[in-house]
Amino acid sequence: TDHLGREVTIEKQPESFVSGYYISTSLLIALGLDDQLVGVEAKADKRNIYKLSAPELTELPSVGTAKEFDLEGCAALKPDLVIVPTKLKDSIPAMEELGLTVIAVNPEDQTKLFETIDMISTAADVVEKGQELEYWISDALESLKKSLDGVETPSVYLAGNSSLLQTAGPEMYQSTLIENAGGVNAASDITDTYWADTSY
């Protein structure tokens, strides 16, 4: 069951993936599956984490963004499994008509991040690696929490990449990162969007 509540049947262990979302791409790298990626989201060559951990990904075909996903380009890559953000829910029926197996993920808080790891590791038959990744993250968060004991909780404004007046709302994983680091998201009251426009 994916994050849209869809029951997805995977007939055989996938050997090739398309990831239309940087978080799922990063998780595929962490699970040791980057060599099975055949297509990734747009602007992969701009992400330093890819350049450092899996530079070959920057040369893969782009399947676009959540706003402009390249259905035909994705289908042409003939992946065994496509992983997309839930924002692309309206495009999934068309993907399935093209014969693609699709799971939709929304790893925008700690629980959903672990659910996404579970989904991907189960689909790829690397459950043990998925569990190891979750244990590693949990241990790191616990150590961080202990180090912050008694520290004052600051209000944090996280500016967007495209504008200093754009900030991450509480529906985004960036808000979880702020909380994990001992802060409070200054935009926590904005609940109707992901990136929110602000003014001064």
Locate each region found by the language model.
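A short, structured surface patch at a secondary-structure boundary
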Residues: 19-77, 81, 87
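Extracytoplasmic substrate-binding proteins
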Residues: 7-9, 91-166, 184-189
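Short, low-complexity disordered leader/linker segments with a strong preference
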Residues: 1-12
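Alpha-helical, coiled-coil/dimerization segments enriched in small aliphatic residues
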Residues: 166-196
